[in-house]
UniProtKB/Swiss-Prot annotation:
Peptide chain release factor 1 directs the termination of translation in response to the peptide chain termination codons UAG and UAA. Pfam families: PCRF, RF-1. It is found in: Cytoplasm. Its main location: cytoplasm. One of its GO terms (cellular component) is cytoplasm. It comes from the Bacteria. Residues 284-305 are annotated as: Disordered. One of its GO terms (molecular function) is translation release factor activity, codon specific. Gene3D superfamilies: 3.30.160.20, 3.30.70.1660, 6.10.140.1950. InterPro entries: PCRF, Pep_chain_release_fac_I, Pep_chain_release_fac_I_sf, Prokaryotic/Mito_RF, RF-1. This is Peptide chain release factor 1.
Length: 361
């Protein structure tokens, strides 16, 4: 039977009891909200630990009964059946607790900056980028999250050449972080008269929304340019210099924002995206260094990595990182079955973390 860090479990149980006792006292509203949130987060783990310890005690009592020479054959048979039922239940609880004890990504509860760009495939790629955005928008709605478009460049026949949106909701990054990469679509375009299947692609980037304290950006490292916003064909669409282009000189990261008529709002949006991109670039650099010797199955999150194929003629979606195929393309692209892919990716990632812990032990 797999072992658990019993001393750590004792500390968690004591901490939970302390929080419950404190919650019954007179508290400032801010502290009450903080305690309530923490209790909601750790109570499922605490309940699993209590159930596990109760089952372990029950198993020990059962095995003692089986080993007792005074136990008659009928009672021993019943005890053996109970033991055979308890053992796998305890193993399941151990696995559940080990997963719950895994280190949490500090960004998991953050909002998300979602960037989708049409790749190879011309107009079809733009249409597919639009399909992906609506898929995430619907998925977010089902989670009770809010989606706000920050910037959008529409395709000539529909969809988007590029769209950037903020996904606001608790746990948004934890759910969407494995969506970064190249998404490929195979389907027959409406304009295709001979029924040939075309392949096109779009790139998705999921960045945790970060704050000033998360990223140190010096004013001297920024080059800020203002200009008049441009519409299709390059013509100027207003007479004031409301568009903003910000370059982070050390990294070369550039963000341009012109969707609002307000220069102040464009600058705030551009800085928000810039912070997230700088943080993400550093995060990827650190992750790459950590996994140089061990390639994780879930994938590196590299923007150039093809992660998923949506095959419309066959009605299937294949995630290449975990070799999972679902014949539920309409439900996935509608955002309704996307959670099945996300859950499978999360499980695979947790398994990789547990394996790494075991190798390090």
């Amino acid at each position: 039977m797999s072992s658990l860090p019993e001393a750590k479990l004792d500390v968690l149980l004591a901490h939970h009891a302390s929080l419950e006792a404190e919650s019954l006292g007179q508290l400032a509203s801010e502290r009450y909200v903080q305690i309530t949130r923490e209790l909601a987060e750790i109570t499922p783990l605490i309940e699993a630990v209590k159930t596990y310890r109760s089952a372990v005690k029950e198993l020990a009592d059962t095995e003692a009964l089986i080993a007792d020479p005074a136990t008659d054959a009928e009672m021993r048979g019943m005890a053996e059946a109970e033991r055979d039922e308890l053992a796998p239940r305890i193993e399941d609880l151990v696995q559940k607790i080990r997963v719950a004890l895994l280190p949490k990504d500090a960004m998991d509860d953050r909002n998300v900056v979602l960037e989708i760009r049409a790749g190879t495939g011309g107009d079809e790629a733009s249409l597919f980028a639009g399909d992906l955005f609506r898929m995430y928008e619907r998925f977010a709605s089902l989670q009770g999250w809010k989606v706000e478009v920050i910037s959008a460049s529409e395709g000539t026949v529909g969809g988007y050449k590029e769209i950037i949106a903020e996904v606001q909701g608790r746990g948004a990054f934890s759910k969407l972080k494995f969506e970064s990469g190249v998404h490929r679509v195979q389907r027959v375009p409406d304009t295709e008269t001979q029924g040939r299947i075309h392949t096109s692609a779009a790139t998705v980037a999921v960045l945790p929304e970060v704050e000033d304290v998360d990223v140190d950006i010096k004013n001297d490292d920024l080059r800020i340019e203002t200009m008049r916003a441009q519409g299709a064909g390059g013509q100027h669409v207003n007479k004031t210099e409301s568009a903003i282009r910000i370059t982070h000189i050390p990294t070369g990261i550039v963000v341009m924002m012109q969707d609002s008529r307000s220069q102040h709002k464009n600058r705030a949006s551009a800085m928000n995206i810039l912070r997230s991109r700088i943080y993400d670039a550093e995060r990827q650099r650190v992750d790459a260094a950590r996994s140089a010797e061990r390639k994780e199955k879930v994938g590196s999150g590299d923007r150039s990595e093809r992660i998923r194929t949506y095959n419309f003629p066959q009605g299937r979606v294949t995630d290449h990182r975990i070799n999972l195929t679902l014949y539920k393309l309409p439900q996935v692209i509608a955002g309704e079955a996307l959670g099945e892919l996300i859950d499978a990716l999360t499980t695979e990632h947790q398994a990789a973390q547990l394996a790494a812990q075991g190798a390090a032990a």
